[in-house]
Amino acid sequence: VQGTLSPAEIIERTAQHVRALLPGDSAHDWWHVERVRRNALAIGAAESADVHVVELGALVHDIADWKFHDGNDALGPSRAAQWLSELGEKPEVIEHVRTIVTEVSFKGAHVETPASTLESRVVQDADRLDAIGAIGIARAFAYGGHAGRAMYDPDIPPQPHASFEDYKKNSGPTINHFHEKLLLLKDRMQTAAGRRIAAERHEYMLAFLERFHAEWNGKC
């Protein structure tokens, strides 16, 4: 198909491909990708980003998530690039999307995850917005159940992971995940729109945690 598909056709083929590939975990399913795509397009437009690159990056950002491939974080960028190459996408677009997929993931509380291009910053923010707020709470418990994690254990404190390897090995209770990742995301947003949306979603999570602990302790 090299050289025969329009940008719109490449987007549509990629959406179909990703939808067929994604795992059964409802926290990382097609609807997660679709929400990230919508967020990314809105943020990208506000930031005057290349929306074709942004949309492709959002669509393939979880094409081979390390959480479902034995911790292999090189597989996603490789598969994204291979797929786009098969569609005849421009080499410079392929490399840009590969960079987005490489940079998108959170890798631990004490691990820097800089995004090297505007489009990468847009997709990273869009993905992180889907990890916080009401949707983020639902996704956290959906994945925790999928992974067989405890909901909460007051005897197991949160762990401030110092490396990506430590973060990959984490199997702590879902409530800990709020302190290990979700509550950190507000201050790591890299676009104006991302920061604005994250601030409200962050407050929602704080209110949820306050209520959760009150109910856990029989205070309401």
Positions of PLM-derived features:
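Divalent metal-dependent phosphate-bond-processing catalytic cores, especially two-metal-ion Mg2+/Mn2+ enzymes
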Residues: 2-5, 9, 21-47, 60, ...
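An active-site-proximal "capping" alpha-helix that borders the catalytic cofactor pocket
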Residues: 36, 72-86
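Amphipathic alpha-helical interaction elements
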Residues: 45-48, 64-68, 85, 89
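His-Asp-centered metal-binding catalytic motifs of divalent-metal-dependent phosphohydrolases/nucleases
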Residues: 51-69, 76, 97-107
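Conserved strand-to-helix beginnings and helix N-cap segments that scaffold or border functional pockets
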Residues: 69-73, 134-135
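Hydrophobic, well-structured mid-protein blocks that either form specific transmembrane helices
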Residues: 87-124
